Amino acid sequence: MRVGEALVAGGPPGTAAEPEVVIGELDGPFGTAFATLIGNQIKGHTKVLAIMNTDVMVKPATLMVSKVTVKDDKYTNILMGTVQGAIANGVLDSVKEGYIPKDRANDLGIIVSVWLNPSVSNDKNLDHKILFDIHRRATTSAIKKAMNNEPSIDWLLENQDSIVPVSYTHLRAHETLRY
């Protein structure tokens, strides 16, 4: 089993992508977890297969799980339209680039935990092309990291003291000192 994540930003507000992926063999414990997720639907967190179109499932079989509780139809349409297509294309890009061996496409499965900013529902000027491209790149990057075991434990240990979480840096910049 392999695990990876990526953060890709750089577009308009609300278009950043932060997928987390788990990749494993479909005929083992991972496959059991994959099937259980499909069968265990929860309101607001529907799990769906990543598809290229209404009846063209991507390979390796990829299950999308939303990190955000889905509450409205517009958000659902963006998640199950633009982002679903982007994830499917990111998976195929990973096969094309050799991160996932083509001859393993029927044996492996991918679970993608998807972050889609809820603000997209209210963006009247949402650029679906930018949103698509960012989620596609983020999916490919997360899969690449997973399949290449990145970052390595050696790199993490070497850089541990110089890595500062973005959220922490942002909070520190706005912190008021109290004595």
Regions found by a protein language model. Give the residues of each.
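A short, hydrophobic C-terminal helix/tail in secreted or cell-surface proteins
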Residues: 173-179
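Accessory interaction regions appended to the cores of large information-processing enzymes
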Residues: 1-172
